[in-house]
A protein has these predicted regions:
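SAM/dcSAM-binding transferase cores
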Residues: 1-38, 173-241
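Conserved beta-strand/loop positions that form the S-adenosyl-L-methionine
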Residues: 45, 68
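Conserved beta-strand signature within the Rossmann-like core of class I S-adenosyl-L-methionine
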Residues: 146-153
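A short glycine-rich, Lys/Arg-flanked "PGG" loop and its adjoining helix->strand segment in the class I
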Residues: 131-145
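S-adenosyl-L-methionine
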Residues: 80-106
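Class I SAM-dependent methyltransferase "Motif I" SAM/SAH-binding loop
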Residues: 46-50
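Conserved SAM/SAH-binding beta-strand->alpha-helix loop
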Residues: 71
Length: 241
């Protein structure tokens, strides 16, 4: 099942064009020029319809947020949410996680959010998981030392797999929970998260902090965006996030 096409997508995108970064490569190393007063630069991978993006940015107006999403029909909803709230600290990139090192220079990002990514359950597709060791090594190339990855998923198998991957890639784990909202709602939810929480599905969360290493783990170039595209029937659609 693919996401439903949004009507009037092009004119709607045009109305939000000041929130879109058409060529993120040109801003590599200069993102803070967009918001010189920003105390942090945070990147969200797969913002979906942007509820988490907009609400988090609204609570932290002194933080610069860059939301990366490759599904235009989802991204337009996120952009409209941001524009409706009058937020000036959020920008969007129509791009792919595999190209983060093209978009950001070493140490440029303070935090990365990964919320409810595709679990890619088949072992033969393990390298496509956004928490595979190789992706986590890729993120090291844009995070500062001490920078963090905040990861949430409803998929227990993906979560347990990820807990094994983070230390291998040079991150210290903290705030590990397998039932984030067990004692009441904790933090800002995505649309997808709220839906499954209401159904009684436990939400898993952890934080990985980038450690300084004398020798960086070897990064193996990742396949192009087309090879990383979600399969039909993927559990987590951009429409849901």
């Amino acid at each position: 099942m693919r996401m439903r096409k949004k009507p009037n997508l092009i004119p709607r995108m045009d109305r939000c064009r000041d929130r879109m970064i058409p060529d993120p490569v040109e801003l590599r190393g200069h993102w803070r020029d967009l918001m010189p007063q920003a105390r942090e630069l945070r990147v969200e991978l797969g913002c979906g319809k942007g509820r988490f993006t907009a609400e988090t940015a609204g609570l932290e107006p002194d933080v610069l947020f860059v939301a990366v999403e490759r599904v235009p029909d989802a991204m337009i909803v996120a952009m409209e949410r941001v524009v409706e709230k009058g937020l000036s600290n959020v920008f969007f990139v129509d791009g792919d996680a595999a190209r983060l090192r093209d978009y950001f220079s070493p140490g440029e990002a303070d935090r990365i959010y990964i919320n409810f990514c595709d679990p890619w359950p088949s072992n033969k597709h393990a390298r496509r998981r956004l928490t595979h060791e190789n992706f986590l090594v890729l993120y090291r190339g844009v995070l500062r030392d001490g920078g963090q990855i905040h990861f949430k998923t409803d998929n227990r198998e993906l979560f347990e797999y990820s807990l094994f991957q983070f230390p291998k890639a040079g991150y210290e784990l903290s705030e590990v929970t397998r039932d984030l909202h067990g004692n009441g709602v904790c933090g800002i939810m995505t649309d997808y998260e709220e839906k499954f929480h209401d159904l009684g599905t436990p939400i898993n969360r952890c934080v990985g902090t980038k450690l300084h290493l004398e020798q960086e783990p070897k990064f193996r170039p990742i396949a192009g965006p087309r090879d990383l595209a979600p399969q039909d029937g993927s559990k987590v659609l951009a429409e849901d996030r």
